[in-house]
């Protein structure tokens, strides 16, 4: 991660080298690092804001870490501090907004997977995986998304 927003190399090192047990409470730090890196690699000529989605419902809460614009729509970006993690909130957001593509930033390598959403009559959701160390490539990953 090439960040010029102060010396966060220690934080980055902790996230990238921690064990699974260490990562239990590092989700918010991973989200922060990804958000700062996304801002760092956006056009410097325009003021950018980061957006997220939260649904507050009785006895449940759902959130998507970042909502990024692409062409005439949006692409949700989910951040996971490890290689695994549930994505019920992401599926809910995609279902409600009728979206088929998303990005997951995690400790995984580049890749993609497809999810058959049985709650939406078997619609297929496509997720591109962006390693946390490569958040600078999110714009390129979005360009590879088929609309």
List each language-model region with its residue ranges.
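A cross-kingdom feature that marks ATP-driven nucleic-acid transaction machinery
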Residues: 1-147
């Amino acid at each position: 991660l090439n960040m010029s927003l102060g010396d966060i190399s220690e934080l980055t090192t902790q996230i990238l080298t921690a064990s699974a047990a260490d990562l239990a409470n590092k989700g918010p730090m991973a989200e922060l690092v990804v958000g700062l890196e996304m801002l760092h690699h956006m056009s410097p000529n325009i003021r950018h804001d980061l957006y997220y989605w939260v649904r507050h419902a009785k006895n449940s809460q759902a959130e998507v870490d970042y909502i990024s614009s692409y062409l005439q729509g949006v692409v949700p970006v989910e951040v996971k501090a490890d290689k695994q993690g549930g994505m019920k909130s992401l599926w809910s957001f995609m279902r409600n907004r009728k979206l088929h593509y998303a990005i997951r930033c995690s400790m995984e390598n580049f890749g993609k997977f497809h999810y058959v959403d049985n709650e939406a009559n078997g619609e297929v959701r496509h997720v591109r995986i962006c390693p946390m160390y490569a958040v600078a490539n999110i714009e390129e990953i979005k360009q590879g998304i088929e609309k």
